[in-house]
Amino acid sequence: MDLPGPIHDFLLVFLGSGLLVGGLGVVLLPNPIFSAFSLGFVLVCISLLYILSNSHFVAAAQLLIYVGAINVLIIFAVMFMNDSEYSTDFNLWTVGNGITSLVCTTILFLLMSTILDTSWYGVIWTTRLNQILEQDLISNSQQIGIHLSTDFFLPFELISIILLVALIGAISVARQ
């Protein structure tokens, strides 16, 4: 969207904080229904971020596929689960939680150091060369492919990681 700078920055901070709050809700809420609704909120915030960055097609695909199909499927599956195991015995901290938090914290600091040490100047020039190449393309699907592999590479990969985690979680729930 072509918004003035302060409004764009405010919406960016607002949606980013919504992502953080929703992500914490997914992880920390003990009731799986509330966690699934929080995941839906996170996915809607991501699609609004796509709209904010002028990628309306990806935002529509995000809403239709992830919020409209996958999140509804997760909520449907959670509602069929037996909720007695969540209400009776709820341990606040286990060894597995400690190991998981240690691994996630390590990955977070590695990602932060990688982001801070990356020369973003070269990435900007690569993007500009792709924009020059994009003017010669005829097909919109080719333009979408170029945007997904350059401008929106990180969000696209994050969405694929979220799907992978959801599949692993579904498999582990099905085994129990």
From Swiss-Prot:
User: Is the keyword Translocase assigned to this protein?
Assistant: yes
- Keyword flag Acetylation: no
Q: Give the stretches traversing the membrane.
A: 10-30, 32-52, 61-81, 92-112, 152-172
Q: Which GO terms describe its molecular function?
A: NADH dehydrogenase (ubiquinone) activity; quinone binding
EC assignment: the record states: 7.1.1.-
GO CC: one term? chloroplast thylakoid membrane
InterPro entries reported in the protein's UniProt record: NAD(P)H-Q_Oxidoreduct_6, NADH_UbQ/plastoQ_OxRdtase_su6, Nuo/plastoQ_OxRdtase_6_NuoJ
> Please, which domain of life does this record's source organism belong to?
Eukaryota
Keywords assigned by UniProt, alphabetized: Chloroplast, Membrane, NAD, NADP, Plastid, Plastoquinone, Quinone, Thylakoid, Translocase, Transmembrane, Transmembrane helix, Transport
What does UniProt give as the signal peptide span?
A: none
What main location does UniProt list? Answer: plastid
Quote the catalytic activity from the record: a plastoquinone + NADH + (n+1) H(+)(in) = a plastoquinol + NAD(+) + n H(+)(out); a plastoquinone + NADPH + (n+1) H(+)(in) = a plastoquinol + NADP(+) + n H(+)(out)
Its record classes its membrane topology as: Multi-pass membrane protein
Tell where it localizes: Plastid, Chloroplast thylakoid membrane
Q: Which family does it belong to?
A: Belongs to the complex I subunit 6 family.
Function comment: NDH shuttles electrons from NAD(P)H:plastoquinone, via FMN and iron-sulfur (Fe-S) centers, to quinones in the photosynthetic chain and possibly in a chloroplast respiratory chain. The immediate electron acceptor for the enzyme in this species is believed to be plastoquinone. Couples the redox reaction to proton translocation, and thus conserves the redox energy in a proton gradient.
Q: What is its quaternary makeup?
A: NDH is composed of at least 16 different subunits, 5 of which are encoded in the nucleus.
> PANTHER family from the xrefs?
NAD(P)H-QUINONE OXIDOREDUCTASE SUBUNIT 6, CHLOROPLASTIC
Which protein, by its recorded name, is this? NAD(P)H-quinone oxidoreductase subunit 6, chloroplastic
Q: What is the lineage of its organism?
A: Eukaryota, Viridiplantae, Streptophyta, Embryophyta, Tracheophyta
UniProt lists the gene as: ndhG
